[in-house]
């Protein structure tokens, strides 16, 4: 999808790691910018501390513009954690969106961040997240989501946050290294396109396999006030509630962290709608990367079963 881009790439991520897959994708984006594609990258600050050199270098390219969402006032070492403790209410509000939009015509949205553990390159862990590749009117919603966060008062130009641009020699080495890594193809499961023409050809093949159906994107806009919790229910929560209340045959849930309140479980429960089947797939204790989140789910597991919800837990292998 990067190689197929002709005009623009807008990418928004919670995590973009400075590892093999992160640098590979950064290199592909850099090569797109080299041929004139306008690139905007919006990254959450919480995981951006260790990748300053990579993105400070990319930000020097005339066709690449990078913003950081909700940055800490003190951005290095212990100072970052001091900021977290002193300004917890604001710093705890993170941007978990993962959106990738090309030319305003095709987009990818889902749960996958950019890092080796999300693409099967990490030997110790593998996060099996899902993405959806879409085109058509629903991509307008993806673009609107990106634009809302990009123009948010909480999105700061990366150039305002990094102390200085890399030295010329260091910058040249980093940029050339990224261009070379983009060609190297780090043990990919399939061969990647080698240019824009082949990229568009591969994308056309993917489009021929797509499911044609009505689609709607629901996203929560960036908050106006970071310092106080909102009393207004989020768009996504309301949309899920409407779907659950109107379901007549089946509800399928897949979530890494399945933590629901009692009233949400009652709304999902099939005991009052015998014809409704509800099934949920989540992590087991062995496959979960956050024990605290599993504990929050496990305490409600007996009640979920009482409500007629079938639960499936992912094995660690």
What spans do the regions from the language model cover?
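Charged, low-complexity intrinsically disordered terminal segments
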Residues: 1-98, 102-317
């Amino acid at each position: 999808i990067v190689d197929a881009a002709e005009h623009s790439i807008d990418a928004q991520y919670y995590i973009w790691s400075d590892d093999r897959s992160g640098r590979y994708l950064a290199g592909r984006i850099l090569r797109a910018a080299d041929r004139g594609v306008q690139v905007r990258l919006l990254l959450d600050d919480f995981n951006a501390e260790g990748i300053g050199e990579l993105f400070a270098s990319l930000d020097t390219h005339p066709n690449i513009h990078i913003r950081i969402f909700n940055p800490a006032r003190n951005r290095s070492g212990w100072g970052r954690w001091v900021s977290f403790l002193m300004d917890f209410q604001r710093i705890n509000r993170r941007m978990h969106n993962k959106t990738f939009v090309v030319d305003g015509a095709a987009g990818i949205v889902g749960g996958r961040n950019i890092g080796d553990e999300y693409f099967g390159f990490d030997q110790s862990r593998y996060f099996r997240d899902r993405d959806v590749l879409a085109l058509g009117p629903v991509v307008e919603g993806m673009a609107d989501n990106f634009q809302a966060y990009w123009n948010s008062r909480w999105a700061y130009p990366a150039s305002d946050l990094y102390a200085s641009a890399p030295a010329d020699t260091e910058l040249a080495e980093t940029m050339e290294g990224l261009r070379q890594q983009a060609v190297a193809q780090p043990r990919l499961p399939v061969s990647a396109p080698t240019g824009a023409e082949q990229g568009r050809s591969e994308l056309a093949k993917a489009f021929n396999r797509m499911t044609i159906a009505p689609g709607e994107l629901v996203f929560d806009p960036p908050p106006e006030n970071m310092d106080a919790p909102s009393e207004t229910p989020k768009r996504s929560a309301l949309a899920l509630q409407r779907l659950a209340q109107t379901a007549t045959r089946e509800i399928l849930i897949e979530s890494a962290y399945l933590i629901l309140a009692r009233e949400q479980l009652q709304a999902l429960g099939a005991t009052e709608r015998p014809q409704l089947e509800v099934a949920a797939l989540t992590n087991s204790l062995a496959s979960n990367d956050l024990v605290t989140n599993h504990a929050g789910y496990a305490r409600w597991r007996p009640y979920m079963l009482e409500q007629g919800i079938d639960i499936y837990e992912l094995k660690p292998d």
